[in-house]
């Protein structure tokens, strides 16, 4: 707020306010030589206002935990789970009869497992999976204050599930030549509950070609996209420095 007060009157922002803060915490515990746990948390809040009638706010929240397990001298596993949240809101009250609040938020939940398997002194296999569930509030427009005549409008919420499995091979063939190859198989599914339009066969999507409205129940897989992703790279050292 102090910085805003230093601005010239003609800037139009002299009566504005701004502020932010962040909180973070990490807890790590080693149970023994084979098992350890890390827990992480983060929260941030930002606010800004050009004046008392126009305000903006943002919030971020992250929380996760990771378990490290050494199964043997050649196999190590990392198991993680977490939650991410972001929200935004804008309040406009210059005109009491048209005052509104606009808000949006997204939530993500994930689990993943990563493994490192040392096949030989210079040959390592990496594999695992990750799955993430998305909950998205695409937008809410609503009246701000009892005098507002704004009509509330809420966009449909979106839910989706994204999952991927991967396998990678790192091999140092010689001190000069190494190869890294891998494959990742990804799946993305749109989930209910949600209503969507059905269009006339062979016609472009348009209001005039809508033939029906389909309602998918909670948790129903409406559409799934999937496919492999390949990766191949090589490194060759011509000299010790190049």
What are these regions (language model features)?
Residues 126-242:
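Signature of Gram-negative outer-membrane beta-barrel scaffolds
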Residues 21-25, 41, 59-65, 81, ...:
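Hydrophobic, lipid-facing positions within transmembrane beta-strands of outer-membrane proteins
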Residues 1-2, 43-47, 83-87, 131-137, ...:
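Transmembrane beta-strands of outer-membrane beta-barrel pores
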Residues 32-34, 72-74, 120-124, 174-176, ...:
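Strand-connecting loop/turn motifs
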Residues 9-13, 48-54, 62-66, 94-103, ...:
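Extracellular loop and loop/strand-boundary signature of outer-membrane beta-barrel proteins
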Residues 3, 26, 36-40, 76-80, ...:
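Residue-level detector of the transmembrane beta-barrel scaffold of outer-membrane proteins
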Residues 12-47, 55-77, 81-83, 119-120:
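Transmembrane beta-barrel wall of Gram-negative outer-membrane proteins
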Residues 15-19, 55-59, 101-107, 155-161, ...:
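Short sequence motifs at beta-strands and strand-loop junctions characteristic
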């Amino acid at each position: 707020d102090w910085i805003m007060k230093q601005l010239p009157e003609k800037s139009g922002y002299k009566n504005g306010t701004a502020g932010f803060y962040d909180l973070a915490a990490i807890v790590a515990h080693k149970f023994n030589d084979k098992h350890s746990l890390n827990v992480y948390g983060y929260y941030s809040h930002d606010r800004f206002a050009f004046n008392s009638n126009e305000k903006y706010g943002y919030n971020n929240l992250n929380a996760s935990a990771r378990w490290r397990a050494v199964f043997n001298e050649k196999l190590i596993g990392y198991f993680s789970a977490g939650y991410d949240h972001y929200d935004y809101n804008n309040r406009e009250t210059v005109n009491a009869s048209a005052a509104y609040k606009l808000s949006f938020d997204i939530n993500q939940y994930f689990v993943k497992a990563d493994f490192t398997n040392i096949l030989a002194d210079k040959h390592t296999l990496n594999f695992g999976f990750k799955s993430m569930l998305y909950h998205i509030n695409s937008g809410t427009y609503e009246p701000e204050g009892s005098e507002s005549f704004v009509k509330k409008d809420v966009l449909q919420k979106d839910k989706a599930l994204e999952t991927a499995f991967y396998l990678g091979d790192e091999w140092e063939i010689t001190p000069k030549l190494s190869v890294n190859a891998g494959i990742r198989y990804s799946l993305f599914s749109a989930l209910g509950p949600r209503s969507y339009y059905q269009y006339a066969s062979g016609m472009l999507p348009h209001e005039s070609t809508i033939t029906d409205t389909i309602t998918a129940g909670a948790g129903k897989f409406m559409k799934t996209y999937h496919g492999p992703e390949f990766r191949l790279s090589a490194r060759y050292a011509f000299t010790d420095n190049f």
